[in-house]
Amino acid sequence: MGLKDYKIAWFTEGGWQGKVTLDNPNMRNDVSTKYILGAEHYPIFQIPQVLQHFGDNYFDFGIVTLPKTNTEQLMKFDMMGDLKKLCKRTISMQEGPHWLFQDYTMEQQIWWYNALTEFDMLFAHNLKDVSYYKGLVNKPVHKMPTLMLTERLGIQPRSEWSDAVIIGGNMVRWYGGFDSYMVAQEFDMPIVAPSMGRKIDREDEMDIQHLPYMSWVEWMNNLSQYHVGVHLMPTHAAGTFALNCAFHGIPCIGYVGLDTQEELHPHLTVYDGDMEQAKKYARELKEDEEFYEECSKVSREYYINSLYNEKNFVPYITRIFEGLHEDN
């Protein structure tokens, strides 16, 4: 069976319903994955209503992305009980770093853990997350590669670029923006940053050009112009920034533990907090043109051969769904 032969429902905190189409301007990784799977999206808080509408065992697979917030709302109904009635097989999709639930109340932490133990399978962002969840719940866990549909959407890799550095986030611990800013200064180039949801007051007073909020397609086209990326983000999840840079062949300095960084920018990956080595790499990229060209070439080639593009992602994910379906 092909992926779109299965009936797949995907539940998130998003307030929309339906299937993803290619004209969606925000075709980031999670949206792209829904498109490739042919999944029908529903708001997670409407699981009881979806069950009432379709009845038992309507979907072959039900994927749930448990939201970072509003856990107390999920605790008000039998989410897993209803989900297991509605779907023949249930799957959890990681959202954010694997430790995030440990910032919740004790009651919410126990609810979260119990929910994970009831899924038939879990998807995780990085290999370290796979190991974490396998140890936590003793369930089948697979890596869900961070998918981009750049080729299908007609986005072109960069052919020319300006002398500017782009950092991957704002000035909060979640993104590690201050550390990225300090390393970016080594290039003696203008520094640019996206505007994220956690942007703080007075951040605009820094000598950083902040980009306006953009759709994903706009972001990818804009990104193509930059010389180098720096993203010392201590919060490891999907790793989209390092991946986006690699598509364009933009060298990116970042941390160990993020698969997209380690796999696509192996010469520029440092241990958490190793600002000294990060600055050394920055100076080497600035002063050694041969090193820069090698890092650029490697990132682009490794992306082409990775699971992060449609060509390689589809057979990988198809095997996983076929295996879970056969176990039914």
Task: Give the label of every model feature segment.
Residues 266-276, 284-289:
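Conserved acidic donor-binding segment of nucleotide-sugar-dependent glycosyltransferases
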Residues 120-132, 138-154:
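Donor nucleotide-sugar binding/catalytic pocket of nucleotide-sugar-dependent glycosyltransferases
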Residues 224-237, 250:
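Acidic donor-binding loop of glycosyltransferase active sites
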Residues 287-325:
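A charged, aromatic-enriched C-terminal amphipathic alpha-helix characteristic of glycosyltransferases
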Residues 220, 242-248, 261:
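Short alpha-helical segment that forms part of, or immediately flanks, the ligand-binding pocket
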Residues 104-121:
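Membrane-proximal helix-turn-helix segments that form the acceptor-binding/catalytic region
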Residues 1-87, 267, 271, 311, ...:
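N-terminal pre-catalytic "stem/leader" segment of glycosyltransferase-like enzymes
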Residues 20-30, 150-204, 210-216:
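Conserved catalytic-core segment of nucleotide-activated headgroup transferases in glycan assembly
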